[in-house]
Amino acid sequence: MGPLSGLRIVEMAGIGPAPFCGMLLADLGAEVIRVDRLTAADLGFDIDPRFDFPNRSKRAIAVDLKSPAGVALVKELIASADALIEGFRPGVMERLGLGPEVCQALNPRLVFGRMTGWGQEGPLRGRAGHDINYISLTGTLSAIGPKDGAPVVPLNLIGDFGGGALYLALGLLAALHETKASGKGQVVDAAMVDGVASLMTMHFGYLQAGFWRNARGENAVDGGSPYYSTYLTRDGKYMAVGAVEKRFFGQLLQRLGLANAGLPDQNDRSRWDELRARLAEVFASKTRDEWTRVFEGSDACVSPVLDMEECVDDPHLAARGTFVRRDGAIEPGPAPRFSRTQAEISRSPVEPRADTRGALAAWGLAQARIDELAAAGVIAPG
């Protein structure tokens, strides 16, 4: 059983960070029931439920949230929950009749987790946005990319999942801990702009200390330095180099056969371009896999750049079980690891219309009540 075993969480279905937060908590043992609309929302794309991994380890129900009976059912679930997760724009839960005041009147200990991009307050609170917008406004996107080019758009990991889902999970667990002492719930306002700004804490400090330049691609660990970058190999693939410390940089040069080549000091910014060109020339002489073997066993901080199909077979990740194979799919396993109360994927993602009856029964609703709701069209018949 995971370390969060015994926690009960209602998750209002959505996409991106809110369901990912629910997945993290469910993998750690929390009992999470996902509430989907009876009529699926048009998100502009469809994905086979088997591969909708953020919905794993949860039960799911489909409810008519436009009907008073459907809202009453959700209130019934909330009354016995420890926490709620929702990722709608500000005001949507209130319009459904499920705002914090209503829910905490039913359950004073409820921790009400709200996941948004802009936050519950502020002039942009009601505006649409995505990861790229949240990282652009916080100084993050401006700092990513080469010095002579446009900002490079990263995967939607920084805002959605780093600054969003992880901060919501942290906030929920902190509030749940406080509830043990106070007996009172509270609202957790997890805004991606706040989370992303928080992730930039070190960089803002370095900037004001004069250690970091306010220009992308000109710093030690933003791709500006030749010792923290990627290099093209003979077969058109790449190696990643992170030899920041002098002793690691020394091993890098040794393995490249450049230890006695009279190269510039690694921290001589005026000669970074010269050093980078020399490293690039050598890396281009072998294939990625050949270089991987060259650096095996070293502390040069050099690794192959693997794609999502290659990484699942990496020997180190395979030894740790970082990726798991189940039900015909490959997915990242739960993280982090625990010595006694191991996290686990307790169930594969389910289609809510097929799981509704079982999920409600597992939550504690009587069979007669479930039959009544299904007959009235309040829930999916499955």
Region annotations inferred by a language model:
Residues 138, 164-185, 198-209, 251-259:
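Oxidoreductase and adenylate-handling cofactor-binding alpha/beta cores
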Residues 296-317:
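Conserved PLP cofactor-binding pocket of PLP-dependent enzymes
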Residues 1-171, 175-181, 351, 355-382:
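N-terminal helix-loop segment corresponding to the beta1-alpha1 unit
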Residues 39, 118-119, 192-197, 235-237, ...:
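Glycine-rich beta-alpha junction loops
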Residues 1-8, 215, 232-234, 310-382:
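Terminal low-complexity tails and localization/encapsulation signals of metabolic enzymes
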Residues 35, 209-216:
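Short Pro/Gly-enriched beta-strand edge/turn motifs at strand-loop
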Residues 227-298, 302:
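Aromatic-enriched alpha-helical interface/lid elements that frame and gate functional surfaces
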Residues 120, 148-158, 180-196, 216-223, ...:
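Conserved Rossmann-fold dehydrogenase catalytic segment
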